[in-house]
């Protein structure tokens, strides 16, 4: 299990990555392919703490865009990040 600091460094250092975390929406642990920067822009993801949870906002490469055309997703308390 990686620390939040290790995960943040990893996503900042790699163009694409696989991030693993528990998704309440699905009720299970999932792994998603993402980037820290929105494609074709300089807009970066964010790492913040919300009510004691470590939250990473990343661009999900394979996600269906939401109604605003966005593919930003929140990984809460991710357990692992690795090269895609």
Where are these regions (language model features)?
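A short, Trp-centered hydrophobic/proline-enriched beta-strand micro-motif
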Residues: 13-21
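Residues in well-ordered beta-strands of folded domains
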Residues: 20, 35, 59
């Amino acid at each position: 299990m990686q620390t939040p600091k290790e995960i943040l460094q990893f996503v900042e250092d790699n163009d694409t990555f696989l991030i693993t975390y528990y998704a309440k929406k699905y009720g299970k642990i999932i792994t998603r392919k993402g980037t820290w920067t929105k494609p074709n822009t300089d807009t970066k993801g964010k790492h913040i703490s919300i009510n004691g949870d470590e939250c990473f906002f990343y661009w999900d490469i394979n996600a269906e865009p939401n109604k605003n055309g966005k593919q930003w997703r929140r990984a809460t308390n991710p357990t692992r990040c690795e090269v895609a």
